[in-house]
Structure formats: C-alpha cells, structure tokens
Amino acid sequence: MKIIENFLDVNEVKQIKEHYKNHSFTCNIGDYANTEVDQKLFNKMLHEKFITLFDSYKITQASIYQRCYLPFGIHTDSKTRMDPTRSVDTEGVAVLIPLDEGEHFNTVVWKEKCANNEEITQLITDFVNLPNDKVQNSNITEEVDLDFAWEKGERNFCNHLTLDGVYNWKLGTAVIWERNQLHASSDFTKHHKYKDAITTFFE
C-alpha cells in the first residue's frame, strides 16, 4: 500500500463533486451506486496524473465515481474475481481517490492476497482451525471500527491478518494497493450517510 500526497488539489476535488452533484448513477444496487467518470473530466483532472504515476497505463475498466452507503467487508478486486477467465500473471493495482474525508473514513489493507472469494473462504477456514498459539493479533480492530467485517469472538480474523496499512481518507490524497490484496472499509455509517470516491483498476 502506498499513499500519494497532493494527488489532487482541493479545488479539483470540489470541481469533481460539483460535476456529479445532480448526476444520476448508472448502477445503483442499494449498498453502493456507480457511474463512469466523464471522459472530459478524466482527461482534464486525472490522465496526466496517472501518466506521472505510472509513465504509461492501461485501465482494466473505466474509472468509477462511487457512492457507498454501506462499508465493504474484507474482499479483493482481483482480475480473476471480476472475470474468472483472466490471468493473474499481471495482477495490476487499484487506485482510490477519496472525495470525502473524516476520521471515520478508513480503508484497511492487509498483505495477504487472494485471487477469488473461494480463496478468501479457505483463508478464513484455515484461520478458524488454527491452534491458539498460532493466532496473531495486530489489534487493528481497537483502532478502526471493523466489527461488521467478520464476527468478533475470542479470536478475530481482521486482527490475525498481516496489516499493510490504514489509509485515513484525506482530500487531495490517493492510495494504491495490489488488486489481489485483502482490504476492507471501516464502518462509517454510524456517523455519515454515505461516502464518495473515484476508484480505478489498472492492468
């Protein structure tokens, strides 16, 4: 996980928010709503920044303006999870650009990697069957509200995983991680109705 400071300036963030103020979402399934980032806006605000970041790049799917009403639990955005026919030889990265900020907006990224939901399920199963002396405890759930992400008991899956980092959403910054890395959102719903961000998946 890598945090990029000064990726956008605050005025650019305001322009993006204003652009989508009365915009209808093309996909709305209740938990979240998506729409593709307008191409003119992308060219104006993001293209050169991505060139600076990667020299050259290929986007797997369009950049997405996303509004989340509920936090995402532990998952990956791997290419094979989105499309089982895809190769994992070049997994690519995800770039998250927050359009809101606050102490309750956090993305937690772990070092463990999974290609699909089945591998995540197996990882949890292996964890449940571990002897007590093999269970790790990073105490991340004491710092970030992750109670929704996995049932809390005597042992906690979120605490057992190897922490890569916690990204507190801050306007103007961005964060990058490998697409097959496990990650989750903190529970912001006790304090906010929703949160907005731009997410882009790269080859």
Each model region followed by its residue ranges:
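Catalytic core of non-heme Fe(II) oxygenases with the double-stranded beta-helix
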Residues: 70-203
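Non-heme Fe(II)/2-oxoglutarate
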Residues: 1-81, 113, 131-137
